[in-house]
Amino acid sequence: MSKIIELPEILANQIAAGEVIERPASVVKELVENAIDANSRQITIEIEESGLKSIKITDNGEGMSEENLPLSILRHATSKIKNQSDLFRIRTLGFRGEALPSIASISELRIETSTADSPYGSLLVAKGGQIERQEVISTPVGTKITVENLFYNTPARLKYMKSLQSELAHIVDVVNRLSLGHPEVSFTLICDGREMTKTSGTGDLKQAIAGIYGLNTAKKMIEISNADLDFEVSGYVSLPELTRANRNYITILINGRYIKNFLLNRAILDGYGSKLMVGRFPIVVIDIQIDPYLADVNVHPTKQEVRISKEKELMALISTAIAESLKSQDLIPDALENLAKSTVRSSTKYEQTKLPLQSSKLYFDPQKNDFYIKEPQKTTELTVSEESPNFTLYTNIDNTVKEDRNLDQTSASASVKHASRSQDENQLSEHPNLDFTNKQKMEQLISKLENEKTSTFPELDFFGQMHGTYLFAQGKDGLFIIDQHAAQERVKYEYYRDKIGKVDTSLQQLLVPYLFEFSGADFIQLQEKMSFLNEVGIFLEPYGMNTFILREHPIWMKESEIESGVYEMCDMLLLTNQVSIKTYRAELAIMMSCKRSIKANHALDDYSARHLLEQLSQCQNPYNCPHGRPVLVHFTKADMEKMFRRIQENHTSLRDLGKY
């Protein structure tokens, strides 16, 4: 029988580090939380090689005394709790005394610190958990911690690190969450000499949101507030027109601590009710102030899982707060955003059709090969240009948020367009069960589409439409009912499949380039996956903080589709993560065909309906949309006669057969 021994302290710390320190982002999280607990108001994070080479955290907090400095890297040595009762009223982000010892055991650590009441500072250098030296130095009040060669003595952990861009995206996400949880602190994140994130630290949460997600996003966030005897809920949620493809943009904070909680996520979605499209999620920042006795944060090594007493009451409070705030808002999307762009085009407006409350008449333009809606004639002319001094497309947020841009970019802003996301994201989904994240299901669908055989199509004569959704046509074999959305989706799919598959290298130069704004984490991930976009003819170049510029577009993409199209491509690339070029092209064709097709409640004139049927007849497989739904159903003459009892197979009563 093996003998039980007590593990050496260094080995025990390395084992503990496996729970607390999963990746470089974990180091950043723990050290920044310590800086916040030290009442810092300015925190600078400097990263080299995504944190694997170097992580440097500098703050202007209270600092540590010369006596306390060596104790800081001992396990379970902390200044934040003193006895058992303190464990049940934790208000600090850290309290276990595990972070620094864990980091010190798997890296080369350097701590420079000074307090306000000390004439000098202290330096501590440790490697692998062992203190190498401690000396007196001159340093400003606060603390600077440098972590180098992370995981140098745990090669197994280093082996399974993801790409540098992926690890950097995790770091940016951590800093963003901490910034949202503490808008009173000014955060600066610098990666390999390049500034990635910067917040002002004014205490204005909406201004922090603008610094992280962009000015245009912050302008579409509305404030929520609710409280009872146990909880205070406050924060901002996006209008239903502004959504994302995953839950990554939902930030829930309890007493300033970012947490993950499925039930609270569900409460947020319940607050939106039916205003969100299936598979779309809002941008949310909610801060919950709670008595520490009602929340137990000591249940997980990363402290991101929290047990909450009276959780059902809190869920109801959140749902009500969101529902009430949305109820007081005008949820009709603002048309002024695109007014300047629409005036420079022709009077006939070409657009991706949407699902309106009332049916709209569609017309077909053979030159543009697309459907459009005629704009109603106006009694007075309104001319607004982007240069008009009386009209501002991008205003300050509540007169407090100011856009921080370099002078060279400001001067160039007049010659670029700020792209906005399509406002039809929240229309009812024609395919609620389509899930691009389901790899197995998508592979089966793509394989089925690749093996389609060319089919013949009957000659049809269009004669009517029902509810702006279904077309009626007759042929030699009887009556055919066609789903107009599925029909055009099939037509568009084969078009995009052909164009994206070939990826014509011909590009059209844009007269005015477009700017596309993303969050810091998404910006980094897109840089890593830019080759996928290049393969389909989209070339985005970095342009300032978290922004790409598009100077040219593939000739197969209409200029009117650029803004929504590029955002949709990027969203899908972020959603599907690792895909092959072949799979990405196939999924992109499916997605674009669905979003570019006419929806229900659109009445087609005779010419448009006949042209759609003609296009459908030329498809390789006109009988199913890319998702497998039927495009049309067929009733033979015999079927019609049976339905009206004009013929019966025998003289047996249908009532006797149990059919009626």
Curated annotation (Swiss-Prot):
Chain intervals for the UniProt region annotation (Disordered): 408-436
GO biological process, one term: mismatch repair
Cystine connections: none
Protein name: DNA mismatch repair protein MutL
Protein family: Belongs to the DNA mismatch repair MutL/HexB family.
Biased composition (Polar residues): 425-436
Keyword DNA damage listed: yes
UniProt KW keywords: DNA damage, DNA repair
Gene Ontology annotations for the cellular component aspect, listed alphabetically: mismatch repair complex
InterPro entries: DNA_mismatch_repair_CS (IPR014762), DNA_mismatch_repair_MutL (IPR020667), DNA_mismatch_S5_2-like (IPR013507), HATPase_C_sf (IPR036890), MutL/Mlh/PMS (IPR002099), MutL/Mlh/Pms-like (IPR038973), MutL_C (IPR014790), MutL_C_dimsub (IPR042120)
Function, in words: This protein is involved in the repair of mismatches in DNA. It is required for dam-dependent methyl-directed DNA mismatch repair. May act as a 'molecular matchmaker', a protein that promotes the formation of a stable complex between two or more DNA-binding proteins in an ATP-dependent manner without itself being part of a final effector complex.
Molecular-function GO term, any one: ATP hydrolysis activity
NCBIfam families the record matches: mutl, PRK00095.1-3
Lineage of origin: Bacteria, Bacillati, Bacillota, Bacilli, Lactobacillales
Transmembrane segments: none
